[in-house]
Every structure is written in structure tokens, then in C-alpha cells.
Amino acid sequence: MPDDFDAIVVGSGPNGLAAAVTLTAAGLRVLVIEGAATVGGGCRTEKLTLPGFWHDVCSAAHPLAMASPFFRQFGLAARGVRLVSAPVEFAQPLDGGRAAVVTRSVTETAERLGADGRAYRRLFGPLTDDAAALTELLLSPIRRPPARVTPGLVPFSMNGLRSAAGIARRFRTPEARALLSGAAAHGMLPLTSVPTGAVGLMLTTLAHAFGWPVAEGGSARITQAMADAVTAAGGRIETGHWVRSLAELPPARAVLLDVTPRALLAMAGGQLPVGYRDALRRFRYGAGVCKVDFALAGPVPWLNDSCRQAGTLHLGGTFEEIAAAEAAVAAGRHPDAPYVLITQPGVADPSRAPAGCQTLWA
């Protein structure tokens, strides 16, 4: 392959690889450059603890691998990637052995919520029925109003512009309020802030419509399939090459940077408008996260059976307790009882660990 390209992609996370897949499929000459030894960015799988235990380095559950327009067209299954879901998509343990539980079925989930069952069905039924159109809209560039109003767009717009705390007022039971808080807390914002309503609604809708699956064998299977598609179409991938400046890149008609704001400023600052450079310097990263990988001798003995069957768990207690924890983080304090996101890949994918053992992502 010649050393001049139609496009160079710096960074091989899922976004960078998606760009490379799209460009090579169009017949363009593409070079992907990755600083790490392997492709994938946060979507990688490595042996981080004991022999025989495979752990996802960052991303673990992948509802958007089922839902996004790109992946629906890319066809992971046809490329040998199996996405597998646990019997329970996510659960949230509560005191006394109780739990808030979300399964693929809106009806089954609602039946577990007692007095809040009807309100839950009214909220998530229309959203789930229209999940594909909603996902495509939310993942598209915001250039113009949608060409058509789909059935789920109106209820999502009305509720998605509210905070999780505002939506939670629809519910009376601790279980219904808790499951909304666990999903909304993925936004890493106070639950009184407006974006958290949309986060909670969309993630719960995805659980019902597509599931929260893991990739059999590890998240790296997803990005490796994307990398294989790039090279099969004539693209080239270089790993172990940290780009310090755009000046070191070979000639290309376009350069796409799948990097952080600070990395963009470092490698391209001199070629960016002054106002944009200042915006990059002012960019504030979100709250810090500590992630721990466990190699377990067996499954976690949760008190609630549904928690033992869950692929993902949200720890933190009731809506009020999780709201207090997220508010403390936003105020720059360490909460006494932090919100903890857990994935149990082995519930759906026993291949991650030796027989009888499991991995835990927390």
C-alpha cells in the first residue's frame, strides 16, 4: 500500500474504527494509527488477574451494539461475534433481600413493581415499541428536526427533558424509583440535573428492546471484528504508534481524530482556531471513576435470586441514597455509600473464567 491515503484515523476505539469501516467500505485508502499495542480503546479484553480469567478493560455491557444504526448495518453476528444476555438485564439490590429488576419484557418488569406496574407500562411501553427509531434519532447529528414524528418521540421528548428526580415522582414504590435511579446514574451527574432523565429513559428502553448483552469471549471481539473488516477492505492498521503532532502523519485528504480534548490540543493545537483552542483548554472532564476487576471462585451469593441472574447490577440502595451519592460527587466529596456499577459477564458467558469460576467488573 502506498504511503499516501485518502484518510487517516488516529485512535482505534469503536468510533475511530467505525469511521475506518465506513471509509474503507466506500473504497477509500485508510490508515488507522493506535498508540496502544492492541486496537479497541476502551473496548478491549485482557488477562488482568489470574490465568484463565478474561476481563473487559473498560466497556462491558453493550446495548448499543444491538441498537445503533451502524452496528445493525455492520452485522456483528455475521462476523462471528455473539452478543449474549443474562436472564435479567439489570437489577438493583435493596435492603431485606428485595431488588428492583428489569427484564427484556416490559410487562414482566411492570408486574414485579406492584402498584407502579401500570405507570411503568405507560412510560416504557411506547418507548420500547419505538426504540429503533428513537435510537437512530438520538445517535444522529442534530442538524434539523426529525423528518417524521414516531410514536415514541413525543413521550420521550416530554419526559427526556426532565431530571431523573422529576420522572421518579411518577412512581410510589421504592423498587420502581430505584431502578430509574440506577440507570440514570450512568450519566454521572446529580439526579436533579436535566440530562439524567433522558439517560435513565434511554438505557432502560434499550434493556427492554435490545437487552444489555456482553460479547461472548470479551468486548474485544467487537472491536477486533471491526479491525478485521478494515484490513479485509484494504485498510491498514498500525499499533504502538503514539501520535504527538499532526506533522508526523503521512499525506492524506482527511484526518479523523478519535482522541480526547487534551490529546487533540497537543497534536493539533497550532492548526486550530484560537477560540476552539481556548475551548479545549477549558474543557472539564467528568467525575473520576475507580474500576476493580475480580477473579472469583464462584458466583456472588446475592440474597435476591434475580440479582444472581443479572448481567448488570446497580449498587447504592434507594433512589434517595443514590441521589445523595451522586450529589456528593458533583460537589467534590467522596460519598460514604457510593454508587457502584457491576457487571457479571459469567452469568451469560461462562467462557470468561475457568469452570465454576467467574469474573466481576466493578
Label every PLM stretch briefly.
Residues 235, 239-354:
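Mid-domain catalytic core of redox enzymes
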Residues 121-146, 263, 338-361:
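Helix-rich C-terminal "cap"/substrate-channel and partner-interaction subdomain
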Residues 11, 170, 258-259:
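Short, well-ordered coil/turn residues at beta-beta hairpins
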Residues 202-247, 253:
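Helical element adjacent to the flavin cofactor pocket in flavoenzyme catalytic cores
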Residues 3-133:
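N-terminal glycine-rich phosphate/pyrophosphate-binding loop and immediately adjacent elements
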Residues 196-207, 355-358, 362:
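Residues forming anionic-ligand binding surfaces in small-molecule and nucleic-acid pockets
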Residues 95-195:
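Rossmann-like flavin
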